[in-house]
Amino acid sequence: MAHPHLLAERISRLSSSLEKGLYERSHAIRLCLLAALSGESVFLLGPPGIAKSLIARRLKFAFQNARAFEYLMTRFSTPEEVFGPLSIQALKDEGRYERLTSGYLPEAEIVFLDEIWKAGPAILNTLLTAINERQFRNGAHVEKIPMRLLVAASNELPEADSSLEALYDRMLIRLWLDKVQDKANFRSMLTSQQDENDNPVPDALQVTDEEYERWQKEIGEITLPDHVFELIFMLRLQLDKLPDAPYVSDRRWKKAIRLLQASAFFSGRSAVAPVDLILLKDCLWYDAQSLNLIQQQIDVLMTGHAWQQQGMLTRLGAIVQRHLQLQQQQSDKTALTVIRLGGIFSRRQQYQLPVNVTASTLTLLLQKPLKLHDMEVVHISFERSALEQWLSKGGEIRGKLNGIGFAQKLNLEVDSAQHLVVRDVSLQGSTLALPGSSAEGLPGEIKQQLEELESDWRKQHALFSEQQKCLFIPGDWLGRIEASLQDVGAQIHQAQQC
């Protein structure tokens, strides 16, 4: 076997050659190439005139000496037009019912069948055997067929509960194509002088028969790690819970796993990685509604679980909660104690701030969070002058909740221990405390836990950075995963600054 990274580079260059002159069809070419290299079938859905047949023709050039067969189905198509005419000579001389298959589907490596759902039962039944077993019954004997890729196309989906569903289920990869959208690409397409039938692939990049056969065995040796299987099973369970989710047969799941193995193999890896699971978005949908649903569920899986994003956020939440508990315990020791002034004959007890409290704005921590003015509050900012006046003369006192917005009216009092206590509408109280010294930093317990969490985050990010070098995964999906990991990293960093 060639060095894995050299193989990945070769397949990337092969795909680039196949994509030349085809605009906004890179993803379709790459998945069709992956299907061809792993012996799977593809269904292309889209309106006429969007290069569906050209995609199939291009794939012929991925292989040395590959033969192609393409046919436009109609309601009147006969098996002879797809599988070859009957041999009159064999029937006449020997009484044998045998087809002349040269130039037809049974002898082609690349097959393109347009308007596939118009095929009659006789064609469909033979086609199912060809896809499932790679065999063709020709008269009294069974012939092995060399088909590596079947591309079926239509501008419509098969009718539900029809005889076509069995064939549709065999189409592992399903791609929904549309017209060229980008203005620059549209102009380039209009003005291109390239002959679409020219071979764009250098001989050195084409796949030989020996390589293809060897790769089929090596694809099967790619492992499925436990954590990747758990992600697949999580997706399956989630789909089973959704009433509008499409039915996915065990056969389709099994074939999809082989496609993931092929993705890993041709990306230079020895095991399936979470990033390969994005391919399932093109394997599990049935119609327009399920296409969106499948993409949403896989997006949740990739941005929330595949690299432990949600698990790390849950751990972070527990660490932050523990830090709050420690701060509240510390606030008992650092509760702000005001000084009682003399004047026993005064109608109102007067207080003043300690002499060491000199800041013009005071930020005081709540021993326990309270809901004040419809906000969960953990600290209050007071103007020192306003607090001093309230301690001396009483009246109304206002403070900024969590240090933001306008100062809000507060229910504040001094308790018997000469501590400031703020109360909510239900008169639940929370003692106000001076924040700890910034030099103290995070408690050792919290600091260690955050460092361990940051280390785990770095490992997950490094794994993703290594795995994302996958030709078959669109860049926008990789961008969303990167953003989800960066968000987790930012939240960890923010907690470390507290």
From Swiss-Prot:
Keywords annotated in UniProt: ATP-binding, Chaperone, Cytoplasm, Hydrolase, Nucleotide-binding
Top enzyme category: hydrolase
Main location: cytoplasm
Catalytic activity, EC: 3.6.1.-
Recorded superkingdom: Bacteria
SUPFAM superfamilies, per database record: P-loop containing nucleoside triphosphate hydrolases
Subcellular location(s) of the protein: Cytoplasm
GO CC annotations, alphabetized: cytoplasm
GO MF annotation: an example: ATP binding
CDD domains in the record: AAA
Record entry for activity regulation: ATPase activity is stimulated by ViaA.
Binding sites annotated in the UniProt record for ADP: 23, 49-54, 196
UniProt-listed Gene3D superfamilies: 1.20.58.1510, 2.40.128.430, P-loop containing nucleotide triphosphate hydrolases (3.40.50.300)
Catalytically driven reaction(s): ATP + H2O = ADP + phosphate + H(+)
Similarity section: Belongs to the RavA family.
Role of this protein: Component of the RavA-ViaA chaperone complex, which may act on the membrane to optimize the function of some of the respiratory chains. RavA functions as an ATPase.
Subunit structure: Homohexamer. Interacts with ViaA.
Name under which the protein is recorded: Regulatory ATPase RavA
Organism: Shigella sonnei (strain Ss046)
